[in-house]
Amino acid sequence: MRKLKILVVYANHGGCSYYRQLSPMKMMQEMLPDKVEVRYTDNPLEINPEKNEAPPPDKLKDMNWADIVFVANILKFGGPYTARVIGMGKELGKFVHFDTDDLLTGLYEEHHLYDTYKDNKLDEITKFCYYNADLVTVTQMKFAHRIKPYIRKCMAVIKNVIDYSLPAWNHPKTKAKFTRVGYAAGIHHRGDVKVFNAIPHLVNQKVGRENVQWNFYGHPPPDPSKKGTWEAQVWPEYMSHLLRGFKGGKNYNIHYALPP
């Protein structure tokens, strides 16, 4: 029996792509090696940005190879490119799967990329992707209900994959007076951070700052090459919101995220 050929078209190697595409497809191929073959690309149209050239549709190696074209979010070459991948997949007779874990239509103003989406009409491009895809997958039911009017064929709710290959030690209970609490929020969502910054102030006040130690992880090391970009600007803004909750003496640490 011929293997099912899946072309994974990813935007980057960040959390959105990793937990929605890269990790689950890798797991699927490991579990079903005799039934599934997976390829990965971030440029299925094979464009040459420097020359602004691309092969004709019948010469696109990966697109013609695939049975399923699996696209997630807006790709790195922009909204029109993403829409073209969806359209090209349909033109070539492929089953097109579009996944998103962020509400790209009717984006709220506190989203860090609100102006980018508005100025580039990415909400309209996303509606095109929803309408033309054979399958649209999202992260939760509330999300699904909000975009239902734009879906022409099939939609499913799929939670983020759990990466079982990551270490998951069962730490022994400590007798120390500290209680460890984990918090995770995306840097694109100012609203999350603005809500959270009241919590450190409240906890420090209730139990005493001498009994609490806060540790924040994920801040990338300074990168001079990204000076002036949104990536360089978002972290100082993120931390300024977050640290407003700390009044008085410092009882927190900020840890840079170092590559493995």
Model-derived segments and spans:
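Conserved catalytic-core segment of nucleotide-activated headgroup transferases in glycan assembly
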Residues: 12-27, 163-169, 173-259
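Carbohydrate-associated surface elements
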Residues: 142, 161
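A short helix->loop->beta-strand "cap" motif at the edges of active sites that frequently abuts
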Residues: 91-95, 133, 152-154
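Acceptor-binding helix/loop patch of EC 2.4 sugar-transfer enzymes
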Residues: 97-126, 177, 227-230, 239, ...
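N-terminal pre-catalytic "stem/leader" segment of glycosyltransferase-like enzymes
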Residues: 1-76
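An aromatic- and histidine-rich active-site surface loop
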Residues: 72-91, 105, 193-196
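A short beta-strand/loop micro-motif in the catalytic core of glycosyltransferases
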Residues: 69-70, 97, 131-141
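Membrane-proximal helix-turn-helix segments that form the acceptor-binding/catalytic region
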Residues: 54-58, 64, 85-91, 104, ...
